[in-house]
C-alpha cells in the first residue's frame, strides 16, 4: 500500500526534525508534524515555526495535560502502579496518550501512516507502535531509526546541514531527557556507567536535599475513591492539584530516584528520575489504603500490581488485560476516601496522620487498654488450629 500522508510525533529536536525532512523526501507526500503538550517546558510557537520551516505540511500542537492527569496518571495511581518496586512509570504512561492523539489526528487529516522518532534499542518504539496497533491496525507505521543509515548524531547533524535544518549552537545537553507533568528522566552520557553519581546541576524539578527548607512542611491530601480531590482542604481540579503537589514536593527535594531497570527489549538501562508530585501522591495514597482496604482485598490487589505495572511499562495500555485489571483496581478503591497528613523534609516524605469515614481501624478493638469487645482467650483456639499442620509436620519428621 502506498503512503499518501504521514502524521509524525514531532518534538522539534534534532532527531524528529531530521525525520520530518527525511519522510517528506523519502515518501514524497505531505507530513503533518504533531506535538503533544503533556506538561513539558517548551516554546510551542518556536516548535510550530521550526516544523513548518523544516517541511511540514501542517504543525499541530495538542494540549493533553488535563487528559494525561485524569485518564492516565490517576488511574495508575489508584492501582498503586510501580515498576520493579521503584519506577512510577512517568514515560510509560505518557506514550499511549501520545499515540492515541496521533491516531486521532491521522483520522482527522486523512493520513494512512504514522511515524515516531524512537530508536531501535529502547522501550518507546514498542509503546508507540503497540498503541497504534491497538487503536487502528490499518495505519502504516514508519520507524526511521530501524531502516535508515543515519545511525549517529554526526550523521544526523550532517543531514541537517545539507537540508538547512537548524542545529542548536548552544552547549549540548549531555543527557537524553524526557519531561512531562509526572516526571523528568535522564539517561545516557556519564549516566551510562551505573557507578557515576548524577551531576547535582542536572535536576530541574526538585531542589537538592541540602538546599531544601530546614523546617518540615506539613500538608493534607483529601482522597475520594482513590483519587486526590483537595489539598489542605481546598478542592481543586485534577490538573491544578497535581501541579500543586509537584511544586510543594519539589521545593522539599522529594522525588529523586536513581535506578537500573530492565527494559522490555531485553537490556538493562540506568535512569535518573525526578517525580516530585507523583512520589508524594503514591505514598499518601498507599497510607490511606492501610485503614480503608480490607486485608484480603489489599493482598489480592498488591499481588496484581507487578503485572499491571509491567503491562504499562511494556506498552500494553490498550490491551484487554490492562482494562480488566483496571476495573479490578478501581473496584478496590470504592472505599478509599479520607484525608492523609504528610510531612516533607529534605527529600523525605512521611505519612503522619490519616482519617476516613470508611476506616476499618477501630480503636476499641486495637487498644492495649482493657476493652469489652475482644476476648483474648479466643486467641488460644485460633493459634491451635493454625498450628495444626505445623504440629503434624513436626510429628512426621520425628
From Swiss-Prot:
Record's signal peptide: none
Pathway in which this enzyme or protein is active: Amino-acid biosynthesis; L-arginine biosynthesis; L-arginine from L-ornithine and carbamoyl phosphate: step 2/3
GO annotation terms (biological process): argininosuccinate metabolic process; L-arginine biosynthetic process; urea cycle
Transmembrane segments: none
GO CC aspect terms: cytoplasm
Binding site for ATP: 9-17, 36, 117
Residues annotated for L-citrulline binding in this entry: 87, 92, 123, 127, 176, 185, 261, 273
SUPFAM superfamilies: Adenine nucleotide alpha hydrolases-like (SSF52402), Argininosuccinate synthetase, C-terminal domain (SSF69864)
Top-level taxon in the UniProt lineage: Bacteria
Disulfide pairings: none
This protein's record includes keyword Magnesium: no
EC number(s) per entry: 6.3.4.5
NCBIfam families noted in UniProt: argG, PRK00509.1
Family designation: Belongs to the argininosuccinate synthase family. Type 1 subfamily.
Protein name: Argininosuccinate synthase
Gene name in the database record: argG
Amino acid at each position: 500500500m502506498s503512503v499518501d500522508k504521514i502524521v509524525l510525533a514531532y518534538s522539534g529536536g534534532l532527531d524528529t526534525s531530521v525525520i520530518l525532512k527525511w519522510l517528506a523526501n523519502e515518501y514524497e507526500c505531505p507530513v503533518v508534524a504533531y506535538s503533544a503538550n503533556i506538561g513539558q517546558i517548551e516554546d510551542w510557537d518556536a516548535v510550530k515555526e521550526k516544523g513548518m520551516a523544516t517541511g511540514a505540511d501542517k504543525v499541530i500542537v495538542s494540549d493533553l495535560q488535563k487528559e494525561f492527569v485524569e485518564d492516565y496518571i490517576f488511574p495508575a495511581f489508584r492501582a498503586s502502579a510501580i515498576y520493579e518496586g521503584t519506577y512510577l512509570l512517568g514515560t510509560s504512561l505518557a506514550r499511549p496518550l501520545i499515540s492515541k492523539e496521533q491516531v486521532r489526528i491521522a483520522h482527522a487529516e486523512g493520513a494512512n501512516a504514522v511515524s515516531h522518532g524512537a530508536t531501535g534499542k529502547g522501550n518507546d518504539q514498542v509503546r508507540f507502535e503497540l498503541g497504534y496497533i491497538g487503536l487502528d491496525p490499518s495505519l502504516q507505521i514508519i520507524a526511521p531509526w530501524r531502516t535508515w543509515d543515519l545511525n549517529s548524531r554526526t550523521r544526523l547533524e550532517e543531514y541537517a546541514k545539507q537540508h538547512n535544518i537548524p542545529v542548536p549552537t548552544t552547549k549540548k545537553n549531555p543527557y537524553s531527557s524526557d519531561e512531562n507533568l509526572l516526571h523528568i528522566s535522564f539517561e545516557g552520557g556519564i549516566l551510562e556507567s551505573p557507578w557515576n553519581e548524577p551531576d547535582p546541576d542536572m535536576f530541574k524539578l526538585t531542589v537538592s536535599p541540602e538546599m531544601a527548607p530546614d523546617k518540615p512542611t506539613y500538608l493534607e491530601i483529601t482522597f475520594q475513591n482513590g483519587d486526590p480531590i483537595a489539598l489542605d482542604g481546598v478542592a481543586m481540579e485534577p490538573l491544578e492539584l497535581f501541579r500543586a503537589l509537584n511544586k510543594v514536593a519539589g521545593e522539599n527535594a522529594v522525588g529523586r530516584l536513581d535506578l537500573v531497570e530492565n527494559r522490555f527489549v531485553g537490556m538493562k538501562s540506568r535512569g535518573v528520575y525526578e517525580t516530585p508530585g507523583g512520589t508524594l501522591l503514591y505514598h499518601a495514597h498507599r497510607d490511606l489504603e492501610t485503614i480503608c482496604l480490607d486485608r484480603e482485598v489489599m493482598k489480592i490487589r498488591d499481588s496484581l500490581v507487578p503485572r499491571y505495572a509491567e503491562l504499562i511499562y511494556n506498552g500494553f495500555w490498550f490491551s484487554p488485560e490492562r482494562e480488566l485489571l483496571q476495573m479490578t483496581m478501581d473496584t478496590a478503591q470504592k472505599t478509599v476516601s479520607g484525608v492523609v497528613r504528610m510531612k516533607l523534609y529534605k527529600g523525605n516524605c512521611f505519612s503522619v496522620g490519616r482519617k476516613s469515614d470508611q476506616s476499618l481501624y477501630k480503636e476499641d478493638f486495637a487498644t492495649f487498654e482493657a476493652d469489652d469487645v475482644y476476648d483474648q482467650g479466643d486467641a488460644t483456639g485460633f493459634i491451635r488450629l493454625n498450628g495444626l499442620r505445623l504440629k503434624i509436620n513436626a510429628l512426621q519428621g520425628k
